């Protein structure tokens, strides 16, 4: 701020700015912004503008007519910059200044009290050139005059508040003031505006009396407020930051003290009212006692059969009649009928306590029993007891209507209501809490609850009358109707569509032929869906026609939109669902991430169409999901487990499935494979039978398809591009490399692809995911990790960050292989090789979506050779080149299998029974099969026919061994002519026993072994290789029981022991340990007098024993057949008991 600005501010410290500013409007067209830093100090001048302008309207009228910009009064003297002002007033000569001052209307405003002082001041010298502005509080030059702010003049005889200085004058201003130049005094005297003259406006501009009276009434209050505000600002301006902090603390303490005082006053008020209530109760009790005493005296003098009736008396009455009172009927009704009492409140209570003199006390009629047969003393005692009872009842009634208790009872009711609401919101906890509650001592109770879910969800459709609904909305356009069958077949072959089923509609060529609404067409144009894809062109007409459908298409082909668009048309044709009625469309998905993705895609259209959607999945807050369902939802996207929880919660009062007419199963093959089968059937059975059911997936094995078709009604199967085929837009690379080199190769790929887009890395295990995340983070790569052990919040944030490109690398388990749609995902790396074809197709299908190009790398180690056949099949079906190393790896594996070596079998993929991820799950399945066979009385037969490959291998080995046995037997027949009398053993093909062979025995060989040798044609000169093959044949054919029976039949001839075998290889680890421990078997051996020996080797379920080896079994020997069988049955009981105890159950045991 320069010197002239400070001088102008000090000159106007006590003047009326509004008057001088109106004159300045004539010469200055606009108000500048050069002096905005002065506003904080002078803002208290703004509020009194109306006061001066109203009283001086006549003086300012002419000046306002020529005003170009209606600025505030005090701002108009800021139009010139400090440099222009300095040049106009100081750098020019005095004549030039005078001429310029006369030509312009600019006159510095100054109060009249200061005019005389200004005229007497001498000249001042011209100040030096203006310096650059530094700060608001920079030191000013010494030549600036100092004038204390003075009180403005009284205008229209109205009091004006006394202006106080904004801040104290600094020390540098307390110097000798220099006189002003004479020329400056002269021009001030000549150009003094008439606004400062003390005169009243002309009568024509006189304000109305009423307005003046109102203004005079409002002015003192306004001035007082202004004075307080100015004083506060002046104090704050003078204080330092430390003082301001102290002042704030003081104000805070004052506010706290005020609150304490208010609280103390409130407590004192409540105390007074409580005392009043207690006093009122005491007085009422005294009056009741008096009234009861009078009634008691009356009852003692009355006849035995007389009814004593008490009337309403006042507290002022001191005497009561002792004779019976006769009251008319109307008066009796009035006396016996209690008046309606108004609810008491604290607000209606008066401040001062008043004696309850005229308070009416109601007394009830008391009927005394007849006292003819009762002594006088007894009668007196009876009447006294009745009176006491009456008093107690009256006291209890008074307690019930106690005012303070009534008030507190209302508060308790409100608190209980809020508590009930909070309990309702937390009625059911998350899935994790349900699992924790199911552990420990409540296992039995929780199993009962879970078992009851099936019964709770069971619906008798015959007893429910469902409303009719429309399925068929499709109207074929003339263009499609005129197409011939040949043209339709050509168009379908062009789309790559194959159809199974009857009466399938013709495929559409554009969105206009689909029969969609106008809003949907606009949304499709907005989201840039130009034309239908192959799967959309054929499935949309079929779904709009009301048919059940199985849709199979490649990843990224638009399957989600294929069922969403017909679903919207289906819902809009039905009445809107009211709160509590349930949803109309239900979409189920196997993973939470896919459910969220479908929900987001659905909301793009539902918001415009006016439909309500809800997403129900595990891991999230169940209270929010319940609230959404109670408000009403037309579309619900869910996972099966959480949906069952909500359907069964609160006795099925949250929602129901009665209005569901459109059911969608996305990734349906995975739904029936991941153990969701019982849950899916449980939900589907609760939906009306005439629903429309849609299934979509990129892979659909035939076995799963057979299971899925059970819930469909005459479905159409539409395959676009093939079944379990990788898209041709994806470039696939498979590298055979050791485990140690995989990470180094991954770093090389990241260095190439890191800046090209987003990257997704798949692993098979959660531990591998965490380790790889740690290694990449140490290598300075920003990445994310995703697997099932993470919280749902972390999983949602991970997917969101990856889609929003916060970080461009995601390491995930196969959890992310289903339905995850990332637009800019350019690279997929299978760090761990997929274990079956369908998993490989879904992993690789995360890239190359919606017509974009993608790249996929797969690492396979020599130890994972069993997976090579699935990858080769995927490469051949998609038309990609198969590396030579991969073919060599597969050939080596097939060669080992043919030779019968110890190799691991590759999983067969989705079989409809649950994917076999590890040996533990396979053990569980085998145990269940064994228990089923035992329940049907089948113990020693082969496995079920579902295990086709294993059975085929066994049959091949058996056929080869049988041919060799026949050749050996034919040779022996030629050598031994005594074959007339032969014994054919049932159950063993091609085995005969001749009498001569039984007589040819070796005393060094046990009798049982000799019999076995005779059965299988094994002589002492037989080679060990042939003997091994024959024993292997017997083991594979499952004839161990027949051999044991034969031993038991032959051995008694020589008085030897009996033998039994019990295979325990397929039981759980706990069961195997139990029956092989000496302590557990000691009791059995002592009781049955047998010997039990563990033999064989443990083999995992997916391994076949090599020739000459057997699975783990128990060898039981005993003196009699009964003892051996008893020992075997006891061991089986132990195995079954341990197996049932340690059998692992799933999360949802509905069936």
Curated annotation (Swiss-Prot):
EC number(s) recorded for this UniProt protein: 3.6.4.13
Subunit structure: Component of the 17S U2 SnRNP complex, a ribonucleoprotein complex that contains small nuclear RNA (snRNA) U2 and a number of specific proteins.
Protein name per Swiss-Prot or TrEMBL: ATP-dependent RNA helicase ddx46
GO molecular function terms noted in the UniProt entry: ATP binding; ATP hydrolysis activity; nucleic acid binding; RNA helicase activity
Stretches assigned to the Helicase C-terminal domain: 729-890
Catalysis: reaction(s): ATP + H2O = ADP + phosphate + H(+)
Species name: Dictyostelium discoideum (Social amoeba)
Biased composition, class Acidic residues, residue ranges: 428-443, 938-948
Keywords tagged on the record: ATP-binding, Helicase, Hydrolase, mRNA processing, mRNA splicing, Nucleotide-binding, Nucleus
Compositionally skewed regions (Polar residues) per UniProt: 81-90
Keyword Phosphoprotein attributed: no
Gene this chain is encoded by: helB1
Renumbered residue ranges of the record's region Disordered: 1-138, 166-224, 287-358, 424-449, 904-972
PANTHER family listed in its UniProt record: ATP-DEPENDENT RNA HELICASE DBP3 (PTHR47958)
Biological role: Component of the 17S U2 SnRNP complex of the spliceosome, a large ribonucleoprotein complex that removes introns from transcribed pre-mRNAs.
Alphabetized InterPro entries for the sequence: DEAD/DEAH_box_helicase_dom (IPR011545), Helicase_ATP-bd (IPR014001), Helicase_C-like (IPR001650), P-loop_NTPase (IPR027417), PRP5/DDX46/KHDC4_KH (IPR056149), RNA-helicase_DEAD-box_CS (IPR000629), RNA_helicase_DEAD_Q_motif (IPR014014)
